[in-house]
Amino acid sequence: MKKLSGAEMVVQSLRDEGVEYVFGYPGGAVLDIYDAIHTLGGIEHILVRHEQAAVHMADGYARSTGKVGCVLVTSGPGATNAITGILTAYTDSVPMVIISGQVMSNLIGSDAFQECDMLGISRPVVKHSFIVKKAEDIPSTLKKAFYIASTGRPGPVVVDIPKDTVNPNFKYPYEYPEYVELRSYNPTVNGHKGQIKKALKALLVAKKPILFVGGGAITAECSEQLIQFAQRLNLPVTSSLMGLGAYPSTDKQFLGMLGMHGTLEANTAMHESDLILGIGVRFDDRTTNNLEKYCPNAKVIHIDIDPTSISKNVPVAIPIVGNAKNVLEEFLGLLNEEGLKSQTDLESWWQEINQWKAKKCLEFDRTSGVIKPQQVVEAVYRLTKGQAYVASDVGQHQMFAALHYPFDEPRHWINSGGAGTMGFGFPAALGVKLAHPEGTVVCVTGDGSIQMNIQELSTATQYGIPVVIICLNNHFLGMVKQWQDLIYSGRHSQTYMNSLPDFAKLAESYGHVGIKIATPDELESKLQEAFSIKNKLVFVDINVDESEHVYPMQIRGGAMNEMILSKPQEETN
């Protein structure tokens, strides 16, 4: 059995776990680990310019692959800088292991230089956390961390490692565990057969059923089963922001995204339904609006691997705890074995839905003479043939991308849904591109969000990571401005940004390509130019209509079907 120092154990454990990339930033408490990375090799380290960006890069890598992202930061400010990224991963159930350095064990609690209680600070935003007390525990602790992060409902796990446990002068026998035994942690992956049969029977007699798909369906890798099931029973399908791509957005049975900025047909169908089958969803406030008015005639069936999510916000008639893929396979098996089929004709239900679809709630003014954000997203969709990985920041541009770029595959839509973290999109896009070097990766951002982590242009230069940044520049914090327009009588308090840099020239100063677009006439040709450049990052700064709002938009405190539509529809209704 070979002997390794604690620092070497960290690196060798990551290698044995199959880690490809570590995203991080060195500092005193982790210098021995960084030296081991240099000495042992076998792992590519990406040196970021801020620890928050390291977590977002690992996040993008994880979301687009289903693998566990890995982060390495030093103690104190290195660890605390990572917290926002950890929160982002936690709220969206992203598998990640964050290794944080810690001061010497005998100095913990003494207010030592760069000491902070990482376990205490991170506890509310992690799935689990560990502190390593002796070097011999490093392999088993990391094995547990990766297992916990990737199983059940995934999430970030922090491993805090005091500096003395990675001392290079002491060697210990090394063996990486083949498996993990955690008696207190045993996620339920197979749904209860009685509940599954009960749910299927309820679904088959429903007159207005609808499938509501969330991010948990993507985590469960159940798209194939979901498509078979929905098409077998001719069921309408809608999705949360996080679930986009789990079911093909261009399929005729897909009603679009639901929720605050969901489509008319999706939100109205939910409100009018008599049965909702929720698959890997949280029923959070952005998808339910006023809970007291929520879908008054609907019985709810909820499939989720996390039992604490069931009936947390919406009362559930038939709960099913389990992996969505396994449960859907059980559904399909019952349909085949027992020859079950829908006992109701859904033709009249589809006629209602098609009437709502006919209103074309996503239409907008295409003749105004200024560039509309929707036009940009539609052009990006055409030019990428719908095959791009799209990493979005947070704001109006996020909603425009979700509504106007149809995703037909899972893990191609990368965004911060639960935390709504500005500054997420660009570093996440870099992580996605590292995971998919042959894929087209687009970052859709705004002039506000991009400045949150714009320093990562330097990281992209150092490692030659060619993504296309589409910056919808309206010189405002657009989503906040929209609320100020609609709710605060147009009082734009602290949302106008009058000191923006020349983004194109800034990108060029880092060695990238900068492109400016100011008029609709040049939009298509300059975007074509941007996507024709393959080996360099391209920053496309696009001046868009500053007065444009995201529609549809639910009325605050209303029911699912109470919505403000875009102006063209308001004029025709």
Curated annotation (Swiss-Prot):
GO terms for cellular component: acetolactate synthase complex. Residues 396-476 are annotated as: Thiamine pyrophosphate binding. Its cofactor is Mg(2+); thiamine diphosphate. Pfam families: TPP_enzyme_C (PF02775), TPP_enzyme_M (PF00205), TPP_enzyme_N (PF02776). CDD domains: TPP_AHAS, TPP_PYR_POX_like. Keywords: Amino-acid biosynthesis, Branched-chain amino acid biosynthesis, FAD, Flavoprotein, Magnesium, Metal-binding, Thiamine pyrophosphate, Transferase. Binds 1 Mg(2+) ion per subunit. Binds 1 thiamine pyrophosphate per subunit. Mg(2+) binds at residues 447, 474. It comes from the Bacteria. The keyword Flavoprotein applies. It is an enzyme of class 2 (transferase). Its EC number is 2.2.1.6. Pathway: Amino-acid biosynthesis; L-isoleucine biosynthesis; L-isoleucine from 2-oxobutanoate: step 1/4; Amino-acid biosynthesis; L-valine biosynthesis; L-valine from pyruvate: step 1/4. One of its GO terms (molecular function) is thiamine pyrophosphate binding. It catalyses: 2 pyruvate + H(+) = (2S)-2-acetolactate + CO2. Coiled coil: none annotated. One of its GO terms (biological process) is isoleucine biosynthetic process. FAD binds at residues 153, 261-282, 304-323. Thiamine diphosphate binds at residue 51. Belongs to the TPP enzyme family. Dimer of large and small chains. This is Acetolactate synthase large subunit. The lineage of its organism: Bacteria, Pseudomonadati, Pseudomonadota, Gammaproteobacteria, Pasteurellales.
